[in-house]
């Protein structure tokens, strides 16, 4: 592989890079998804190791069902958080399997839609998703995630900026392999900086929960900070202790955490089962819309029509089965990950084999609590700096989608659709509630994210407003031929 190919061209056959470089690229994809993937179990009380195991297995299953053509990684979905909180508000271990039961059924909704698309064709579905809808949705995906990145960066802007600068320098001025692994280098560089700072006298422990000392339920949150300043956080003491205490080998999940345990202990609560279904299954309608947006983003990034080949029905089937499988064994719902789409955009290595390698790494790490703890210990500002770039890249892909499809913003309908999608998606995401909450009865509510609401309203507006001129061409001309691993 010539240097010019590494620097300028999109790479479709990673084997031409050599085994060593492919391994490094696989690690880059794993590091990119890790922060968000382990955050979901941290918030809900689910197993981190089980999450990694079924993120890896789910990704491999997705690739198998999508004919190994789509370079997507499946990680933990944030869309179902409201469902987990509704069933197990305090992460009660005995209640989480009920929430997982609801999520498992939500995954089956994907399969139902996949069957309908296979039966009636993608045209009838994709006519509701023209570029004027998918473009703003993709833009909104990145912008809705941006607050998480900024909040993480704010724990130590110095470290976050170092991570960002490493990515920029490597991606713009890097040569050869350095240019295509900027995310990995950003993680490693900022991680090493945090290790050095933590080991020096400049760092001291600070209890971020000190204001709650003496109150009921008080738990210290000790964090190593530069100069004892909470605005310059490094490693948490808990993460360091986890590394020290974690075993090298361990099983990723326990039977009592699985959905099967509900029906084998003879104490299944039918009321909780019904609540789980009514609360969580409707969320799948929103996540399906997000799935189509993600696949559109990956298609735009890679330059291939994945809606046509391998087909939307296959990607939905892969996502749905991965979600159901993960949930049955007590892991969070899976979803195609925007972070990894950002990695594709930066590295320009589009070979799905690299993503599958990342999935294998995730599976291996799931059986080693020690290795998982080392990755989980990545300081929050490092994750923030990396995420800031990746989320921005997602939105940039949306902008490119709009530009390349030559959307006419001289038409009032196009302006209205784009405006409503963006304002609803971002506005609701940043509102006090963070979602639209729909009460069903005294004990059941449905929570829709800003992205879900914006997407659904945008789809409806596109369907009812006059002036539609978009025709989805399932047999659109494929991407230019690929040769020697590079698109010509």
Predicted regions and their residues:
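Membrane-embedded hairpin module used as a gating/binding unit in multi-pass transport
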Residues: 33, 191-195, 208-323, 327, ...
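Short, non-helical or kinked segments that cap or interrupt transmembrane helices
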Residues: 46-51, 68-80, 125-134, 178-185, ...
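N-terminal signal-anchor module of multipass membrane proteins
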Residues: 1-72, 79-93
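Membrane-embedded alpha-helical modules
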Residues: 95-207, 359-475
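Membrane-embedded helical hairpins/re-entrant loop segments and their flanking transmembrane helices
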Residues: 10-20, 45-63, 279-352, 483-488
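Interfacial segments of multi-pass membrane proteins
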Residues: 85-91, 171, 340-355, 361-365
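Re-entrant/interfacial helical elements at transmembrane boundaries that shape
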Residues: 38-43, 73-86, 293-302, 334-346, ...
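Hydrophobic, membrane-inserted alpha-helices
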Residues: 34-39, 55-62, 79-82, 140-141, ...
